[in-house]
């Protein structure tokens, strides 16, 4: 019972693991660690995706970054930053070989004469920039990045900083971008608080896993740790990267620039608060196979590309569909990944500002002592259950309720921002992607769900983004407010990032002040 692709596969000969975000089995939310170590089960191979001739250097380096994300499993905020830095380094190196584009850090100071603006020089420059960047961010994976360089017939040990050579330009721009990003508020170096990417804001939850003090606020959950398929040990969640609102954005002035108004509150807007909880129970009780497969497809948990990487795979599809040049992909991935960076900052600003309750806590509180109609668990369908027993449709096997506050939805924010960029770059909302599941191929209810072949279709980028956000309501980890305000925030972020990216492409320095 294999999954199969439709439209999205016909444009690519890459292995399935490197195309369009296969959702993967997620066994734990793995709370507490901002950057997780390794996948919970051993992999047969850690090889990078096979490099095919039709994949330009931008796609090859994007795949290298995505493979690192799949294996190292950084949280979505960290993964988005990782992708943005990688593609910013490539863009800044490429800008030296364009007649008008300016780099983010060095402007037009490294611009080379027209006779040097060859395809090969661009490949060399962006590859050294990507290599230095990736090696800095994930030095433990340098052997994999060496393999990509070798495949491009480049010597990764060449440390030249000669600005008259593409190698030197690549290394120089990587130095400049990394120096800036080492001090961007993410705490990559652990110099603001001990431990890379650790919290330095002294965040402490109001509620504990076993005591609910404020029903409007986030409650960390006690979650099982996978142990050979048996669940006998537990961890208590910690807010993942609560400091992220302090990270320097690309296009926004600050992380709070597009902060939405507060979500529904039990103490201030009880009717709307209760209604949204009831809506989730109704969705849970009436889940269709199509909706269940939407949940699984968009899960994007710790052993996949995460939501930011998922949209990079959509961009790879666009590159193939529209027959992109190297120049096209440098610019598209630069704008896309920086929108994902800013989307993460904006979403986590709202999460930190409102510290809002997750549905599982709210539903257990609101309907305590009552029987509710809802999804009853794996293979059980809809049942009447105690409200305190209600769980999202992805508990344990898929990504359990994530380790950070609810409002706003990261999926919704990331996806809406990415869709805005792809719409702007292609000058059209047309997407044309789809993904099919064979009967019984569910990772969660294998053999039962879906009962017949299901195909998810996205005629537009907007439709894909909306489905990503809605999927989090179907599974029960986000309220309507968290989804819709996340979409709105993401669209604002995407438009702002595109405005700045386009100014950089066109060398309009006067428009770059934010």
Protein language model annotation of sequence segments:
Residues 18-29:
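Bacterial N-terminal signal peptides
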Residues 36-514:
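Acidic/polar surface patches and capping/hinge elements
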Residues 1-14:
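N-terminal secretory signal peptides that target proteins for export/translocation
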């Amino acid at each position: 019972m294999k999954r199969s692709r439709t439209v999205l596969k016909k444009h690519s000969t890459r292995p399935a693991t490197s195309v369009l975000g296969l959702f993967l089995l997620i066994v734990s939310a793995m709370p507490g660690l901002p950057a997780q170590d390794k996948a919970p089960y051993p992999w047969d191979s850690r090889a990078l995706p096979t490099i095919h001739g039709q994949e330009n250097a931008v796609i090859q380096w994007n795949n290298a970054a995505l493979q690192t994300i799949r294996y190292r499993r950084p949280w979505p905020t960290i993964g988005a930053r990782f992708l943005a830095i990688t593609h910013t380094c490539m863009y800044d190196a490429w800008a030296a070989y364009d007649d008008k584009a300016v780099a983010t850090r060095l402007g037009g100071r490294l611009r080379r004469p027209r006779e040097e603006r060859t395809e090969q020089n661009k490949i060399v420059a962006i590859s050294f920039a990507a290599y230095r960047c990736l090696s800095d961010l994930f030095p433990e994976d340098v052997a994999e990045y060496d393999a990509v360089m070798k495949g491009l017939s480049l010597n990764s040990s060449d440390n030249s900083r000669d600005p008259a050579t593409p190698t030197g330009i690549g290394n120089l721009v990587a130095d400049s971008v990394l120096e800036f990003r080492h001090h961007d508020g993410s705490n990559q170096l652990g110099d603001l608080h001990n431990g890379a990417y650790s919290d330095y804001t002294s965040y402490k939850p109001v509620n504990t896993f076993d005591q609910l003090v404020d029903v409007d606020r986030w409650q960390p959950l006690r979650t099982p740790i996978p142990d050979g398929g048996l669940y006998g040990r537990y961890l208590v969640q910690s807010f993942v990267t609560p400091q992220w609102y302090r990270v320097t954005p690309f296009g926004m002035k600050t992380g709070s620039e597009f902060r939405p108004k507060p979500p529904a509150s039990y103490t201030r807007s009880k009717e709307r608060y209760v209604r949204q909880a009831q809506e989730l129970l109704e969705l849970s009780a009436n889940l269709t196979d199509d909706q269940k497969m939407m949940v699984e497809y968009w899960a994007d948990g710790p052993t996949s590309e995460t939501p930011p990487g998922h949209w990079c795979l959509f961009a790879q599809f666009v590159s193939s569909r529209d027959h992109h040049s190297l120049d096209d992909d440098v610019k598209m991935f630069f704008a896309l990944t920086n929108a994902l960076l800013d989307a993460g900052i904006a979403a986590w600003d709202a999460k930190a500002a409102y510290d809002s309750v997750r549905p599982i806590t709210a539903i257990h509180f609101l309907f305590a002592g009552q029987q509710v109609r809802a999804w009853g668990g794996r293979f059980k369908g809809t049942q009447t259950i105690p409200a305190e027993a209600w769980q999202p449709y992805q508990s344990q096997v898929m990504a359990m309720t994530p380790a950070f506050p609810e409002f706003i939805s990261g999926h919704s924010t990331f996806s809406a921002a990415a869709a805005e960029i792809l719409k702007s770059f292609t000058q059209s909302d047309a997407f044309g992607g789809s993904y099919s599941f064979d009967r019984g191929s569910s990772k969660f209810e294998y053999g039962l769900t879906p009962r017949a072949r299901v195909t998810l279709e996205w005629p537009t980028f907007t439709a894909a983004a909306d489905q990503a956000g809605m999927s989090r309501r179907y599974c029960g980890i986000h309220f309507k407010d968290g989804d819709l305000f996340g979409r709105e925030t993401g669209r604002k972020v995407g438009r702002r990032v595109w405005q700045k990216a386009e100014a950089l492409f066109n060398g309009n320095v006067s428009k770059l002040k934010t």
